[in-house]
Amino acid sequence: QSIPNSAPLEYIKNLFDNYAFQFDAHLQNILLYKTPELLREQLNPFLENKKYKLLDLGCGTGLSGQCFSDIAKKIIGMDISRNMLNKAKEKACYDILIEKDILSGIPELAENFDLVLCIDTLVYFGNLNDFFEKIIVCLQVNGLLAFSVELANEAATSYLLQTNGRYQHAETYIKELAEKKPLKLLRYASVIGRQQDNEAIQTGLFIFKKI
């Protein structure tokens, strides 16, 4: 039986509409979530002395926006969950918030960006080819793409669907997909992004530059 390309959109929307009200506290206090901060550490050496036009895909409640707002002249956040976006609005670090799933929302954007973030969002997508295809269009030449995935075991060659509904991706799968696009890998790191049921979740952090 083949693995679905992604989680159903209605499932994602309902999950996070219901999760939004305790999301920040649960992630930070229970799951010890720190992926935005870890990705920022990896990205810092490649940042220029300028303010970026930033697109935050799957922005959720805005934890990532908070972590990167100091380097942004403009931040657009996109998420499928209205309740999550309402929480992001309270953080007052976004210029525009868009209620849309990312794959259909990216092509509707009327501008390009020099920094695109996608943190803890690709866990709801298995096949990432469409994601890369759409990102290339909205990313400026020399623009940066920074994202996270949950890492699959070393035996995996592409992606796995876990029983919790989240996907894991193989490091080699990501790199091979990107090699077919005008993207140069600047940094890859394997880190502990959060805890789940007392287990450390191996997270892959990727930073690419459009060439």
Regions found by a protein language model. Name each.
Residues 193-211:
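Core SAM-dependent methyltransferase catalytic element
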Residues 117-118:
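A conserved beta-strand element that flanks and buttresses the S-adenosyl-L-methionine
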Residues 147-167:
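Short, glycine-/aromatic-enriched active-site segment of Class I SAM-dependent methyltransferases
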Residues 166-181, 188:
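Short alpha-helix
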Residues 25-41:
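Conserved SAM-binding loop and adjacent beta-strand
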